[in-house]
Amino acid sequence: MRHGNGLRKLNRTSSHRLAMLRNMCNSLIQHEAIKTTVPKAKELRRVVERLLTLGKTPTLANKRLAFDRLRDRDNVVKLFGVLGPRYAARPGGYTRILKMGFRVGDNAPMAFVELVDRPDPSAAVEVTEDKA
């Protein structure tokens, strides 16, 4: 019986699913917004919320746990140096899932996953234009 097992299998083996979620977590932490399908976005939210909660308390044990899950040193540094302090006062709900229609090839429902309170990308473009 599968009572209490709420994990979506996403039609993948366990190793493929783990690698896919790890790659999506790394992309979301690096770019702070990604585009994916709705079921993948909902599973990604579960994993990323826990990682961002780890990032709020920068202990050595938490850094090792985050590195064990991400396997990317730059993203672990960003998680504890940038994202952790940004969300220190927020008690959860670090991600936002916006539905954005259907994919052209197979009509799969697509979603835009982003971190809330992220810097506006248009503001960064304006700053670089002023310097040039």
Curated annotation (Swiss-Prot):
Protein species of origin: Leptothrix cholodnii (strain ATCC 51168 / LMG 8142 / SP-6) (Leptothrix discophora (strain SP-6))
Example GO molecular function: structural constituent of ribosome
InterPro entries per record: Ribosomal_bL17, Ribosomal_bL17_CS, Ribosomal_bL17_sf
GO CC entries: cytosolic large ribosomal subunit
Coiled coil: none
Annotated TM spans: none
Protein name (database record): Large ribosomal subunit protein bL17
PROSITE patterns to which the protein is assigned, alphabetical: RIBOSOMAL_L17
Entries under HAMAP family matching the protein: Ribosomal_bL17
Assembly information from the UniProt record: Part of the 50S ribosomal subunit. Contacts protein L32.
Domain of life: Bacteria
Keywords, in A-Z order: Ribonucleoprotein, Ribosomal protein
One GO BP: translation
Family from the record: Belongs to the bacterial ribosomal protein bL17 family.
